[in-house]
Regions:
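Leucine-biased recognition of intrinsically disordered, low-complexity hydrophobic segments
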Residues: 1-3, 25
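Short, Lys/Arg-enriched N-terminal segments with co-localized hydrophobic residues
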Residues: 10, 15-32
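TRNA-recognition modules of translation machinery and tRNA-sensing kinases, especially anticodon-binding
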Residues: 33-319
Length: 319
């Protein structure tokens, strides 16, 4: 089971209703500051030291943000609360802090090289590019042209060279998610802790995705943090544990002070599931611009361990 908490969605919004005109409230040192629009929220967060545009001195980089004095404290508080709840307060979870740079083989076996894509459309008139599923109609949002290309897959993973020689072979990816190193370290953790099922491995860290169209402030960015738990269970008990974690995580968000009326569970449709998932339940929050995912809880079955151990008998893992 994979629990992926999307840190980028949870920095400061305290109250909002989906589709309503209710303002967003940001609490700063005990004073409620009202932001009625996303632009006002962005401006307020900058003035008060929550979030700045990254590299703003040189024009900024789209989809990248820096957290200021108040922002970093708020992020740290949230991460510490999550870690305490998921690791320290439980006797069946171990921690991990894995490398950001990831071997291509890891993402080949996991299926990311083939499937971690977004549908990309080009405008032939102004040369702008858009995610196909972001377009309300087949018309360029920049120039209003209807002369668009057919959608094609665009890989979201960042590549970087390893070592001094750029020969096209010695490269790695910046990890697009925090889950895969948990699976590749499964046997290491098992051997060093002598754990028995069920047990989990938790990790907090950066992930990187070369988003086609970053948007809505920090709601879709190219660099962000995830709080991840992979919980390993005996065959046949997966649905029971999925329900347990959905209820546990929903209660955790309420315990952080979120109004339950603003939370909603969404079962992802079969044709929308990630390539690794049998069932996914998203915990959604009603932001001013609509429902957005706070956390995804997925029944990954044995897809990941099975993928990484297939043809690698030296790992001696049966999933």
């Amino acid at each position: 089971l994979g629990l992926e908490t999307k840190q980028r969605y949870t920095f400061s919004v305290q109250k909002a209703n989906n589709g309503s005109s209710n303002p967003t409230l940001v609490y700063i040192r005990g004073v409620a500051m009202t932001a009625k629009t996303m632009d006002e929220l962005v401006s307020l967060c900058k003035r008060r030291g929550f979030i700045y545009q990254s590299n703003e001195l040189y024009g900024g980089l789209q989809g990248l943000y820096d957290y200021g004095p108040l922002g970093v404290e708020l992020k740290n508080n949230l991460k510490q609360a999550w870690w305490r709840s998921m690791v320290y307060d439980r006797d069946d979870v171990e921690g991990l802090d894995a490398s950001v740079l990831t071997s291509p083989k890891v993402l080949q076996y996991s299926g990311h090289e083939d499937t971690f894509t977004d549908p990309l459309i080009d405008c032939r008139s102004c040369n702008s590019r858009w995610r196909a599923d972001d377009l309300v109609e087949l018309r360029c949002p920049s120039c209003n042209s209807e002369d668009l290309t057919e959608p094609r897959p665009f890989n979201l993973m960042f590549k970087t060279n390893i070592g001094p020689v750029d020969d096209g072979k010695s490269f790695a990816y910046l990890r697009p998610e925090t889950a895969q190193q948990i699976f590749t370290n499964f046997k290491n953790v098992l051997d060093s802790t002598s754990r028995n099922l069920p047990f989990g491995i938790a990790q907090i860290g950066k992930a990187f995705r070369n988003e086609v169209t970053p948007r809505n402030f920090i709601f879709r960015t190219r660099e962000f943090e995830q709080m991840e738990l992979e919980f390993f269970v005996a065959p046949g008990t997966d649905e029971k544990w999925l329900d347990f974690w959905v209820q546990t995580r929903l209660k955790w968000w309420v315990d952080q002070g979120i109004d339950p009326k603003n939370l909603e569970l969404y079962k992802v449709k079969n044709d929308e599931l990630s390539h690794y998932s049998k069932t996914t339940i998203d915990i959604m929050y009603g932001f001013p611009h609509g429902l957005e995912e706070l956390e995804g809880i997925a029944n990954r079955t044995d897809f990941d361990l099975g993928s990484h151990t297939k043809g690698q008998t030296e790992l001696n893992i049966k999933s």
